[in-house]
Structure formats: structure tokens, C-alpha cells
From Swiss-Prot:
Pfam families: OTCace, OTCace_N. The lineage of its organism: Bacteria, Pseudomonadati, Bacteroidota, Bacteroidia, Bacteroidales. The record marks 90 as: Key residue in conferring substrate specificity for N-succinyl-L-ornithine versus N-acetyl-L-ornithine. This is N-succinylornithine carbamoyltransferase. GO terms for molecular function: amino acid binding; ornithine carbamoyltransferase activity. It is an enzyme of class 2 (transferase). The gene is argF'. It catalyses: N(2)-succinyl-L-ornithine + carbamoyl phosphate = N(2)-succinyl-L-citrulline + phosphate + H(+).
């Protein structure tokens, strides 16, 4: 594996899952693999789980780790070509990236959608510049359109908790006071569509995702109908994708908050969320604190997904 930005990069899912469960039994089995190798983690945006889990994964593999917060202590970076740099950004990403590549063996990048221009976001300009110019293997720690480390961990979690070979998995939109990127729902849909699960997406009209991520999923605008018989409920907010509404909040309808009313029609479903979660906006206290909430094991599996990804990138270093 030379990069990791989407489900296709991981290859065969059964093999990746088997490797995940192997590593979960012995997290330090490959501690010699990363000896004298350095991971550079670059954050354009805030992080808790991604930062901690990826750093822990690198340590599991014996790597050195450098963490760079672009907006705290580093030069402000210009990202557009052709710009006259007479403002407050003294360095261009096109010089910074190859310099960063000089100091490490693998690069992880976290850069959210800006919601200024959909084409810019969906062309993944930032992470693709790292792939093109760093001279190093690059993996996504969440980009504008996908969050594959999260989705891989979600898949591991579902495989651990499922009670039937083909569970019904429902991803539901839920309200939030701020417009959030589509990266997590896009990525979750992409990974679920790579399985044989029954996969349903439910949201209010106007919140349709990019069709290339929706794929063969059934889209249901009636949340209660979508929840019927579900084995897993994956809640997430996202801003509008379509047309002139890109990046906007179209609804804050609290009827979409996941609570006991919705969970009652499921097949005693497990509740999942990538975290951080806005309680009593996305989900009620009762649901997230219930025995069916698996958000903490889900978050713990971020270490496992990151370890598998880093291991595979290390194995393909020259």
C-alpha cells in the first residue's frame, strides 16, 4: 500500500479485518517494523481521537512521531497557485510539503472541507498536493470528503458486535448547531457499500450526499421507517451538499435527534457515532449512555485501524 485515502486503498476487506483482529490480540507484535522510521502527523484542523490513536498506533510499531499543528506555531501556509503572496501567509504549501518530506518516512494529513467552493473541496486539493509533492507515502487523518481511518474502525466495530452475517446498518442524519463536513458520512457510506450489509441512509430532503458515495444504499426520508429492524444505528450530522446550498444548514429539526422513540423500532440496535457528539442534539443522554451504545469501543478501534494502515505503509517503504 502506497497511500491510504479511501476504501479501495486497503484492498480486500476480509484480509484487512483479519489483520485487525490479529493486531488487537497483540498490539506490539510488529514493534520492530517501524524502528528508525518517522511518522509526521500534520494537522490543519483540531483533533482528539485521530491525534491520540494514530500516535499510539505509530508507537505500537516502534516509530518516531513528529506532530505539527499548522495553525499553532507554524508559518501560515498559502495553498493556492498563482496567488500574489502579499498577505499574512509567508510560505507556500508547494515548498513546505517537500521540506516536510525530508524529515520523515510517512505523512498523515488532516484537512477539512472549507465550504467555500465545492469543487475545491471535492478535488481534495490539500491532501493531493501532499501525495504529489512530498515524495512519501501519505494517509488521510480526515480530508475534505472522506475519513477512512474512522470508517475502517467503524467496520471493525460492526464486525465485532454483529449478531447476524448480514446486519442492517442505518446511517441517520441528526441536527447540529454548526455546518459539518460530509467526510464522515461519505466515507462511512463508501465502506458500508464495500460490504454485503443491508445499508440504509436516512435524512431530511435536501441533505442528499454525493451519489458516488451513496452508491447502492437505500435512501429513506422517513427516519422511523429506516430504523425498523436495524441492527446498527450510525448517527452523524452533515451540511448540505447539493447546488447553491453546499455547506449550509437547512434544518435543525430536533425530531431527528436519536432517542428512545427511534431506537424502540430497531432490532435492539447498537448506537454508533464517531465522536465528538453533541448530546441532546445528535443523540439523547439515555441512548448514548445505554448498554447498546458502543461509541467507546468504536473510538478504541481507531488505534487498531491506524496500526493496520501504518503497518502496511511501512511494509511497502523502499
Amino acid at each position: 500500500m502506497k497511500k491510504f485515502t479511501c476504501v479501495q486503498d486497503i484492498g480486500d476487506l476480509k484480509s484487512a479485518l483479519a489483520e485487525s483482529f490479529e493486531i488487537k490480540k497483540d498490539r506490539f507484535k510488529y514493534v520492530e517494523l517501524g524502528r528508525n522510521k518517522t511518522l509526521l502527523m500534520i494537522f490543519f484542523n483540531s483533533s482528539l481521537r485521530t491525534r491520540l490513536s494514530t500516535q499510539k498506533a505509530a508507537l505500537n510499531l516502534g516509530m518516531n512521531v513528529i506532530v505539527l499543528d499548522i495553525n499553532q506555531g507554524a508559518w501560515k501556509l498559502e495553498t493556492e497557485r498563482g496567488v500574489i503572496m502579499d498577505g499574512d501567509k509567508p510560505e507556500h504549501l508547494l515548498e513546505a510539503i517537500p521540506v516536510m518530506g525530508c524529515y520523515c518516512d510517512i505523512i498523515g494529513v488532516r484537512s477539512f472541507a472549507r465550504f467555500e467552493n465545492r469543487e475545491y473541496d471535492y478535488n481534495e486539493v490539500i491532501i493531493n498536493q501532499f501525495i504529489q509533492h512530498s515524495g512519501r507515502p501519505v494517509f488521510s487523518m480526515e480530508a475534505a470528503t472522506r475519513h477512512p481511518l474512522q470508517s475502517f474502525a467503524d467496520l471493525i466495530t460492526i464486525e465485532e458486535y454483529k449478531k447476524t452475517a448480514r446486519p442492517k446498518v442505518v446511517m441517520t442524519w441528526a441536527p447540529h448547531p454548526r455546518p459539518l463536513p460530509q467526510a464522515v458520512p461519505n466515507s462511512f457510506a463508501e465502506w458500508m457499500n464495500a460490504t454485503d450489509y443491508e445499508f440504509v441512509i436516512t435524512h431530511p430532503e435536501g441533505y442528499e450526499l454525493d451519489p458516488k458515495f451513496v452508491g447502492n444504499a437505500r435512501v429513506e426520508y422517513d427516519q422511523m421507517k429506516a430504523f425498523e429492524g436495524a441492527d446498527f444505528i450510525y448517527a452523524k450530522n452533515w451540511a448540505a451538499y447539493t447546488g447553491d446550498n453546499y455547506g449550509q444548514i437547512l434544518s435543525t429539526d430536533r425530531n431527528w435527534t436519536v432517542g428512545d422513540r427511534q431506537m424502540a423500532v430497531t432490532n435492539n440496535a447498537y448506537f454508533m457515532h464517531c465522536l465528538p457528539v453533541r448530546r441532546n442534539m445528535i443523540v439523547t443522554d439515555d441512548v448514548i449512555e445505554s448498554p447498546q451504545s458502543i461509541v467507546i469501543p468504536e473510538a478504541a478501534n481507531r488505534e487498531i485501524s491506524a496500526t493496520v494502515v501504518l503497518k502496511r505503509l511501512l511494509e511497502n517503504l523502499p
